[in-house]
Structure formats: structure tokens, C-alpha cells
Amino acid sequence: MEANEESLKGKIEKLEGKEVIVESKEDEMDIIIEENREAEQEVMEVKARDGRGEQNDVLMEENNNQGEQKDEEMQDASSRSESSDFNSDEDEQILSRRDDELDLEKPLSEEEIDELISDLLAVESKAAEAQEALEKESLSKVESEVREELAQALRGDELDEAVAAEMMTFKDEWEATLDELETESATLLEQLDGAGIELPKLYEMIESQAPNGCYTEAWKQRAHWVGTQVTKETVESLANAERFLHTHRPVRKRHGKLLEEGASGFLEKKLADGAVKESLAGTSELDWSSLNKVFSEKRDESVSFGSKQWASVYLASTPHQAAAMGLEFPGVNEVEEIEEIDASLADPFLADAIDNERELALTEEQKTNYIRVKEEDDITCDRVLQLRLKRKRRKKRSKQVIRCAAENMDDDSVYLDGNNTTPNFAKDQVKSPETSTQVHNSEVNIEENGNFSNSDVDKMTPSTHINVDAKRDDSQNPANNFRCTACNKVAVEVHSHPLLEVIVCMDCKRSIEDRVSKVDDSLERHCEWCGHIADLIDCRTCEKLFCASCIKRNIGEEYMSEAQSSGWDCCCCSPIPLQRLTLELEKAMRDKKSIELSSDSSSDSSSDNNSVDTDADVNVTISSKKKSKKKIRRIIDDAELGKDTRTKIAIEKARQERLRSLQFSARYKTISSMGDVKSIPEGAEVEVLGDAHSGYIVNVVREIGEEAVRVPRSISAKLKVHQVTGIRFMWENIIQSISRVKSGDKGLGCILAHTMGLGKTFQVIAFLYTAMRCVDLGLKTALIVTPVNVLHNWRSEFEKWMPSEVKPLRIFMLGDVSRERRFDLLTKWRKKGGVFLMGYTNFRNLSLGRGVKDLNAARGICNALRDGPDILVCDEAHIIKNTKADTTQALKQVKCQRRIALTGSPLQNNLMEYYCMVDFVREGFLGSSPEFRNRFQNPIENGQHMNSTAEDVKIMNQRSHILYEQLKGFVQRMDMNVVKKDLPPKTVFVISVKLSPLQRILYQRFLELYGFSDGRTDERMRKNFFAAYQVLAQILNHPGIPQLRSEDSKNGRRGSIVDIPDDCSSDENIDYNMVTGEKQRTMNDLQDKVDGYLQKDWWVDLLQKNNYKVSDFSGKMILLLDILSMSADVGDKALVFSQSIPTLDLIELYLSRVPRHGKQGKFWKKGKDWYRIDGKTESSERQKLVDRFNEPDNKRVKCTLISTRAGSLGINLYAANRVIIVDGSWNPTYDLQAIFRAWRYGQKKPVFAYRLMARGTIEEKIYKRQVTKEGLAARVVDRQQVHRTISKEEMLHLFEFDDDDEKSEAVTEISKQNEAGHSNLVEQAILWTKKATLSRVGGDKLMENLLQRHGPNWISSFHEHETLLQENEEERLTKEEKDMAWEVYRRALEWEEVQRVPFSESPVVPKPSPSTQTEPLPQPKGFNRSRFVNRNCTRIAHQLTLISQGLKVGSSTVCGECGRVIRWEDVIPASKLSAVIVN
């Protein structure tokens, strides 16, 4: 024993002298965390290396055991632990391929024992540190630091909640770390015990040195239970226990291994008679109770590690016994059960084991954590852990070599941390996770024999980033598996190439951006991919250059050979060869979940990086997982934007300044020539000149000497006032002036955001005829890309509005020729000129070279679409909402900058979609996406919730106003207010419908069964949100729909989901970069999930046979059928919209049972009394149904059933004046379009719409979300301040069921038993109906009857939808607040402009003289204030206006901002006028 002790002391002293023992606790934890990652990486490398040599053997073995493995997997699925960290396919492969390396039976060498002891010392040291970190003293210190840091931004209860959340996360992280360390410690102890090391002596030495490494007072002064003097009572109890064990359980050991167990009390207990059993059992209880009594009597909950209670953990053999002894350590409440044993119960050992299992009494928490495991699971876990520890020791030896080599390296090669000479490969990730330094673009190579390869060390560069998650493993970094396509090095941080959709590292991205930002023509030509200047190859269709190495390395040698021999189309012109690299970039970006792009990604310029780094101090403490209202970061200044963005803003400002000055001149001429302002058409802009007989003039704002351009007379005669305004708006942006176009100006883009029904198609046709036929501008080709379902409508509109006085435009369509002749058709279009109509799908495929077999033809088509159009028009442009979609990328490849985006709903879901569309027409105007998030999206969305603070609302209004003002020059918005007087009134009722008892039961069971009501919906909601929503929506329509779908599936019919594809990724600004293929896969997965939910048997026991045939189980169906019946009685036609095909099928079933009025025994028939339009309806058949429905003589048809997505766009059903929306869409635009199918030109009756909404369910929350989206659009596009209707918390808890019906039903039952109560209930219902009828039915007799019939039984409440979108006067910005917000926005840009003015042109500005005043321009009565807002401009602004127009002393002009006449004499003192005269 003494020899072993001396040997052990020598080994510890030897290890203490080695450099392997780390110098600080922080470094120890760093090594532990980093080496786990490196061990996993090495396992993968070994796996790949060995896999090549052993591939055949492994494949043979897998083929032989494939059937057996499948059976075992099916049998063991229920017993496999979900929480197992090691039972994975990867670990099994590692073990199967590395058994020769593991060799657990081989005796350990002295060196390996030294390493094990070293590892144990490190693990125990970190475990002690973890325990100290969880002491009250340590926690109090950390809490005070956290509170002090958070107190800078938070106060009161909010501060307390934030501190509590941070501390909870802090403790959880340390407890998890402690749990991992204890697992490692147990494995190491087992190996040391097997090697013959006396563990008590080892622990005695560890404990004797423990106080020297403590930093808390509690641990420095604690009484150690090992190696210290204990009480006599404890010694006596231990001696009694030892004597009992020696008597009843004699054992013989050698080197710590159990060699033999004699006829102990266990065998005697099995084989002896009952009396002996009772005697032994009693003796055991008496012997052990004395020791347990010692611990139980002096138990103190406040006693921590190192006390007697801690020592008692070694006496507990089961978690139950540990819990009974009062131990509250990790693992106490985790109970594992061995798998079922197939054996005879006659075996006394098995029988006793089973009896013990049955008698096991577990606590509630232990029952919750009850896990069933297999015996091989434990073996696999053990072996994998030992393998990882062995590899970690090898890595530690390699680190010694790195340290030695690092001392001889230059300081420039290694990034040093303070005075420490060791390369900082791993910063502290647990205790101080503030920054981390990583090795960039290199992997240090270490041979098995310890040799160090420093070939790549000189390429190391530091990269600092914020570590958001203190426990995150570096192996999760998506850059670990990706290389930079420019420098071919491992990218520590994955970034997108500024020009190509491929992966580049940070250094390469910055280098490329610096080259792009330098527009000096004298610079050397360089590769657009990597920036090199050697071996460049020209693109034959554009001016871009690419080096041969980039082409060869990234695309392939074959492509390189072809490029050198016959020329090539570069990756910008033909991105098809980059598809693989683009997919890699998408994968890397999706894996980068822990870092939010808006706050941590690099901006497009160095100034962006500075703006991010100079933000308010970022909270880098361990963040809480609790979601709450965002705390937005500092809004970056406009001076910090990229150079390109600032340039485009300046161009737009100069354009508006020029237009304003010319507009005022035109206004003066108009007023003087007309004499009477009243003669100006009401509602039109003041600058409207010309008339319908001679043709409206489009270039009212024109330069001196420029001829007037008129709209053709035949078209002008049919234009309305707002349409004339829209044509002029497009001219001012697309053309600007005749001289500019002829001088080669590329023009600008715009968005015509007129709401549905205002004639956007007619306006575009009029504009194209004016620009391409009425004046010679050299513009002869136009490309119109539109949804395929309105493609033929465009052609018919061109034919309908064809003018007679000018040559008609040629119209081309792909359907006019065969596929083989498409290239010829496009060539003819480019040569002859005209308008080419094309669907989005065909445009995308042809632009990307898809669907064309002939390679030359494919290239020709791509070139024609890219270079051919002089004007590009995109109908329904809100489709352009995904920056990474193929359609968006194809449209952006078109070189034409004269782009017109048509949309009735420019902002549908979120601001990022709006940004995508704006960035298409004016690329770079709003900056990069992170800049837009910081400046507009986050402030606006953060202030639109009910629980937003006053400051949030104020910032929201300011940023909304600034965004509106910034975009109003090229985004023209008009709503139905301009034509309200031409249409009958419209009323939209939102009816809150109660659920039937069966619906409530099904709804609650689904939520509980699939975990949507347990408060743990974060990950589940993300994966299964829309599938669950579809199931619930169908239950809310009718509880029998699952039954109906089940029968349809048995008959081979499958109900489709209509209203899903674009909604899945457009609501919370997430996945807006999802590629098209992924979206289609998401759609298919969604359909499968919905079918899976409905095909399971969770609803079978609740539904009786043919429940779906009874309409009374759904309040929606009762109200729907009643509305249709009453509409038919009064002669009104109705439209019924629903999202799902099964719901429409069920409605058709009920309609087939409705009796015909006055026809005994006759019922409604499809095709006679109702029509149906869905996605399966052919285009020709659809138009026939629409025409028949709109026929005034067709009195028999009562309604048309329409699927929301398939029929809410592109059809006119003005014959109907009743619209019923059975289930609201996630996107409010679809429901709005559904209503506008009836409320449009041609409608003669008042329109009433009924939106049925299930009360207290997800439908009600989604409706509030719709109002939020419409309010967001109103704020940004329509500049209204609407009421906020939903809180952030409601948005995160959409599945919560607010079921008050059970309470109301209980009250109803009680009242029914009481006669007086019953009469009161009837009187209350009558009073409720009268009150609602008198106040809110809006003159709709049908709604009044509906309330009287279904009052409180089915209708919970109702309101008019428009009331929620009325402007909130309290939140409207005053003129002063608007001016202040706009002035703050313009201040940086104006200051930059002043700095750019030459000294000779910027006279000194004196202090304003009180005697100097400007005379305002007299405003006519018809002056439109919505366009020209009076402002108080500065003298500097007036000076800049005078300079920009080149005016001299004595001349005057009108300021486009404040509307004042300005002269040099008014803005500069007389003493300074001489300088202006000279200049």
C-alpha cells in the first residue's frame, strides 16, 4: 500500500512539472471544450480515411446485417432513449471501424496511466470550479455585475426580470458543464481503478490540495471529508458497517479488480429458509440505519460540496436511495431501466431483480425523467466516451508541440493575447464569453508522431466576433466545412460574394468590395471573382473579367478549356454553372442560425462595420431564451451608409428638386392661362394640362424648348383623372425628359401601387403607346412579365384600347409559336419592336437556360431577355419578395433600368418583402438588407404592438414618415378613395362564431396531443406550424372534415391545400431567402404533414359515422347556408371563398340538399344553382363560368364557390354583391382581393362581405395579425396611423385556446333550470340583438335577420373591418414632428452636399437678419397640399437650390421644399453678392 502511495505521489509530482497541466482554470475549460470539438473533427477525418480502405468490408457487413438491423430498429424504437448523447449512427460507425484502435482489454502503459491521472486532475479541478461558481457568494457577485450592466438600459421590474433570466441561464450552463465533467470523471475513475490505482489515496491527495485553488471564502474554509479528522461517532458507524460487509459480503481484490465474490449474504439470502431471510434483512437494516442516522440528524440544506452529505453520495447505489438521503445533485432524479429480460422467473436472481423493480417507489420528478435503455446503449456510451477521451489526450500532446513551435514564430504570424506567449486558439466560452479569436483560413496539421507542420501558420489572421451563446460548440460553425471560392481557404465566417452567389471569406469580401468601390478607370483590370490581375479571360457578352484559376478551381477544367478555346459567357451572364456553389452558400447561411444577420453580419462597406461596432454596448452575457419585445439597436446615421446608396439617394433628390422647380413654373403658367382655378379638373394634380379631345400632356414638367408629348386622343377620351396622374408619374421616372433619353440616360424605375380596380393595365398601355409611338425616343421594345392566369387578359386589353391615330404596337407571346421557334420569335421582337408578353415561370426558365435543348438557342434566348427590352414591366410585382428566388435573380439580370412594378398591394406581409420590390426598381437605394433592417424594419415593427412603449410608437411614426417621404418620388399609391363616388358603398362584417361542443373537444385534443398547448412550441411551431394551422382551420370549418378526408383518401382522392406556398416564408422576415426548390419541397412536406395529422386515429373515437353530413355541428356552416338562402330570396348573388378543397366539397354537399324555391321535391344543382372555380378549373372553362355568372338574365344561379388562391385574382364577378369568406387567409391581400372581385367597376348594388371567424382560436389571432399587416402597409405606403391591435406575446402564442364557451354553457344550464333565469336570458338576447342591430348592421337587413336568428347561440360578436383601420388621431404626427423627423434624416446628406460645394460657390452664410423675409407664393384654392408640404428650409438649403439651377443675382426661383420664392439677395448679405456676380 505504501509503495503504491509513493508511486502515485511520484506520478502526480511528475505530471505537475509537465507543461500539459494548464496554468489557469480558464485555459483548462477552454481545452476541454475545444478538444471535444477537435476530437469530433478527427473522428470524422479518421472515419473518412479508414472508410476508403475498409469500404468493401463495411458494405459487405452492412448488406449481411441489413435485414437484421431493420428488425432490431423497429423492436427497439420504443425503448431507445431520446436524450442519449452517444447512441447515434455516427458513433456506431466510429466504434465499428475503430475497435482495433480502442482495444479496451489491452493493459494500460505507464504513460497512459499518467495521462489518465492528468485528465482526472483537470476534470476534478474544473468540477470544483463549477461547484464554486454555483455557490451563493459567486452567484451574488455575478448577479451584481449583470445588474450593473443591464441597469444602463433597463429599470424597475423589467430590470429584475432580465437579471433573473440571465442568472437562470448562467446557472443552467454551469450545471450542464458540471454534468458533463462528472460523466468524464466517472469514466476516468473506472479506467484508473481497472489499472490498479488506489482511488481513495488519489482523492486524499486531491482534497488535501483543494483549498489552495479555491477563490470563494466558503470553499477556503470548508471542512474536507477526505483526509481530515472525523468524529468518534462517525468512525464507530463506519467500523460497524465494514464489519457487516466483511461478514456477509466477503470479496477478494487484486489491483482494484474484483476477482471473486464468496458465499455472501446475497446467496445465503436466496437459498436459506424464510427465518434466515428475515434475520438477515433485519440485521441489514439495523447495521445501515446507524450510519444513515448520522447523516440525517445533522443534515443542513445549506451545506455544500465537501461536507458529510456530499460524502454520502458514495453510499447511495440507486437514485431513489440518493433522493431518500436528501441529495440534490445532478442525476439524482434521472432513473434508467434496463430493457426487458427474456428468461425464466424460476431463476432466483431474476425473480429478486423483478421484485425490486416492482417495489421501486419513485418521486414525481423521477417518474418524469424515467428512461428505458438497453444494455448495449451503456456499452456504446462507455466506449465512445473512452474513444473521445483517448483522442483528446492525443490532441493535448499535439498542443504541446504547437506551444513550442509558437515560441519560435514571428509575432506577426500568431495573434497573442496579452503577455501570454501561447496562441489563443480558444477563448473563454463559459466564464467570460465576450470575444473569441479564431484561426482564419488555415488548419494546423499535426502528424500522428507529433510533428508540427507550419506551412499554413503564417497565414493565420485574427477574426473577432461576438459569442452569443456561451455554451455553443465551435463545431456548429457553418464555416468549418466550407472553403472560400476566391482564395480556396477554409472560411471562418461565411459571407456572400458581392457579385456572385458563392461563398467567400471576410478578407476576400472586403478586398473585392474595395476594388468595386473604386471607379477610377486607371486601375488595372482584375478578376471579378478573386481580384487577381493575371491570366484573365473576357466574357463575350459583357465587360467582366475572370481569371483562369477561379474558373478551373470552382467550375471545372472542361469549362475552362471551352472558355479558352471558343470564348465563354461569364458567371454573371449565365449563372447555371454556379448552381452547386450557390446551394452551398444557401446551406451555409441556413446553418448560421445563432447569429442574426441584421446585427452581426458584415455590411457592404467599411463604414458599415464601424457603424455596427460603434453601436451601444452589446449585451454579450448569456442571453435568455425567453422571447420578448425587441430592444432595437442604435439607428445608423445616413452618413454611415454605403457610397452607392448615398449616390443614388443624391440622384433621386436632384431629380425631385428639378421636378419641383419646373412644376411651380408650370403651375404659374397654368393659373395665368386658365384665369380661374375652378376650371382645373376636380381631384387632379394642378399641373394637369391638356384635355381629352386634344390629348393629355404627359411631360407637363419639361425643360425649356422641349415639345409637349400627348397621350393618343382615343385613349385620352377614356382616361380618368387618377389614371392621367399615374401616366405622368411613370413618365417622370422612366423618361424624365426627351433630351435625357436621347443623350443616353438609362432612366430610373418606379412602382405604380394603385389598388385593385383602378386600371393599372390601362395606364401602362397608354404610357407605352405615348413613349413608343407618339414621340421618337428610340424605345421600341417592351417586356411585360405577368402571372400566367392574366396573360391573355393583357393581350385582350391591348386589343381593346388600341388607338386608331397611331400605328398599333406588335404583341408577341410564346404561345404563338412552337418551342423550337421561340428564339426566332424573340429575335423578331428585338428587330421589329413591340411588346412581348410572358409569364413569370417561362421568363425564369428561359433566362436561366432551362427547357431549351439547343445550347446556342438557349444562350440566344438568355441574351435576348437580358439585353432586349428597353422598358420592363412586372405585373403583380409583390411576387418579387424573395431576394434569392430564381425569378428575382432572373429579373435583376435584365440590363434595362427603366422598370415599372405594378402592384395593388405593395406591402403584404412584412417590410423585407417591400424592400425586395423597391430594391428591384431602384437597386441599392435603400442600402443593404442589414442597413434597411436597422433603419426602418426594426423601428417600425417594434412600435406596432399594443404593448409597445410611447417611445417605440414615436420612433415607429418617425421612421414610417421618413420611409414614406424617401420613397414617394417613385412609389405612387392610390386607394379606392379616388373612385368611391363612382362605386356603391361596401361594408365588411367580421363575425365571431362560437364553436360547437364537438369542435371544442377536437380542437383541444389536437393541441394537447401534439404538444401545442404545453408552452414548449418554439421548435415545434417552426417545423409544424402551417400543417397544424391547416388541420385546425378545417376543424373550425366543420369537425367532420377529417372524416371526409379520410374517406376521400380511401377512395383515391386527396384534398389539396390552396392557400399555402408563399405564406410559409413571408411573415416574420425569416427564410425570405429560401430558394424555389426548397419552397416546393416545403409545400410537399406540408401536404404530407396535414395528411398525416388527419389520417391518425386521434379523432376516431369522437366522431360518429357520417358526422360530416350534418351541418349543425358547425356554426360557420349554419350561418353560411342561412346567408345564401336569404340572399337568394332577395335576388342577390353571392361568392363563397375558402382555402381548402375539402371545405368546398362539404359546402357543395350541403348545397345539394337546399330545396329550390317554389319547386316541390327539387334541390339545388351544380352548374345550375351554383358554380365552382378552383385550381383544377381550366382557363377557358373559368372564363365561361364568369361570363354566365355575370349575365343579367341568368337568374337561377345563386352563388359561386371559389378557392381563395385560385379565384381571387384576375376575374370580375360584379354580378354578385354578397361575399362570404369562410376561413381567412394568412395573407390579408387574398381576402381583400376576394372582396374586390365583386366591388369594382360594373357593380350596381351595395356590397356586403361576411368574414366568419371562430372565436378564441387561432383564426381570431390570425385575423388580428391581418389587421397588423394592413396597418403596417397603411403606415408605410398610405402614411396612416392606425390602431395597434395585437401584442408581440399574442403573435408568439397563436395556438392558445381562449375557451370561454364552457363557462357560458354552465351558466346557461343553470339558468335553464331556473324559470326566472330563463326568461331573463331570453330578454337579454332580445336586448342584445336590438342593440347590435340599431348600432352596427350598417343598413344590411340580411345581417339584422342573421343576428335575430342566431344571436348569442352562434354569434359571439361582430364588427366592421374598416373601423380597425381608421386613423388614430392621437398617434398622427404633427407638422412640426414631421418636419423634425425629416430634418434629422436630411441633415447628414445636406451637410455632405455643403462639403462638396467648391469654395468659390459656397459664400459665407451670415447670421440671419430679422429684416430679411421671404414672400410666400400665393396658393390657389385647388392647391394640393398632400404633394407639396410647406417646410422651413435653412439658408444653406436655399443657397444649394440656387447653385444647382445656375441662377445669377437678379434671378429667382421657387424652392421645392418650402414653396417660397428665393433670390440671392434674400439668402446672402449685400457685401457678399459681389462674389456671386463674379462667379
UniProtKB/Swiss-Prot annotation:
Q: Would you indicate the residue range of the signal peptide? A: none
Q: Which UniProt keywords apply?
A: ATP-binding, Chromatin regulator, Chromosome, Coiled coil, DNA damage, DNA repair, DNA-binding, Helicase, Hydrolase, Metal-binding, Nucleotide-binding, Nucleus, Telomere, Transcription, Transcription regulation, Zinc, Zinc-finger
> What segments bear the compositional bias annotation Low complexity?
76-86, 598-615
Spans annotated as Disordered: 40-109, 594-615, 1400-1423
Per the record, the zinc finger regions (GATA-type) lie at 483-514
Q: Which InterPro entries match?
A: ADD (IPR025766), ARIP4-like (IPR044574), ARIP4_DEXHc (IPR044573), Helicase_ATP-bd (IPR014001), Helicase_C-like (IPR001650), P-loop_NTPase (IPR027417), SNF2-like_sf (IPR038718), SNF2/RAD54-like_C (IPR049730)
* Residues in Helicase ATP-binding domain copies: 741-924
Record flagged with keyword rRNA-binding: no
Q: What class of enzyme is it?
A: hydrolase
Instruction: State what the entry records as the consequence of deleting this gene.
Output: Slight sensitivity to gamma-irradiation.
Q: What is known of its domains?
A: The ADD domain predominantly interacts with histone H3 trimethylated at 'Lys-10'(H3K9me3) (and to a lesser extent H3 mono- or dimethylated at 'Lys-10') and simultaneously to histone H3 unmethylated at 'Lys-5' (H3K4me0). The interaction with H3K9me3 is disrupted by the presence of H3K4me3 suggesting a readout of the combined histone H3 methylation state.
Say what the protein does.
Involved in transcriptional regulation and chromatin remodeling. Facilitates DNA replication in multiple cellular environments and is required for efficient replication of a subset of genomic loci. Binds to DNA tandem repeat sequences in both telomeres and euchromatin and in vitro binds DNA quadruplex structures. May help stabilizing G-rich regions into regular chromatin structures by remodeling G4 DNA and incorporating H3.3-containing nucleosomes. Involved in DNA repair of gamma-irradiation-mediated damages.
Entry protein name: Protein CHROMATIN REMODELING 20
Natural source organism: Arabidopsis thaliana (Mouse-ear cress)
Name of the coding gene: ATRX
